[in-house]
Amino acid sequence: MPLTPPPDHTKVLLVAAIGLSIVASILTYSRNTLPQVGDHSHLLPHGGVYKDGTKTIVYGGPRKLNSLEGGFNLPVQPWFLVILLSAAIFLLSCRSGHRRVCGQCH
């Protein structure tokens, strides 16, 4: 009875992790966190004017789409901080001249 190595599921798990990360980032970025204006039958999420016999709503519209988007202030943006820290870690790890090698073939 020959010994066989267990199946390698690392590629499947890597693809699943990347897919879940993409889905989570899209859901986070596209989520609407602005307050709703209007009542249950008249919503004005993008601004506008509604006039009824007894009711008038004037809403100028949102200034940003969600809580993650705000102006062009890069140091405050979460995605910019992630990219900046990743680049710093990569550059610092490449600059070190010595590599750790255990000396065994794997």
UniProtKB/Swiss-Prot annotation:
Membrane topology (Lumenal): 31-71
Membrane-spanning parts: 10-30, 72-92
Pfam families: Plant_vir_prot
Cellular compartment(s): Host endoplasmic reticulum membrane
Gene Ontology cellular component terms for the protein in this record: host cell endoplasmic reticulum membrane; membrane
Entry similarity comment: Belongs to the Tymovirales TGBp2 protein family.
Record's function text: Plays a role in viral cell-to-cell propagation, by facilitating genome transport to neighboring plant cells through plasmosdesmata,.
Protein name from the UniProt record: Movement protein TGB2
Organism field: Chrysanthemum virus B
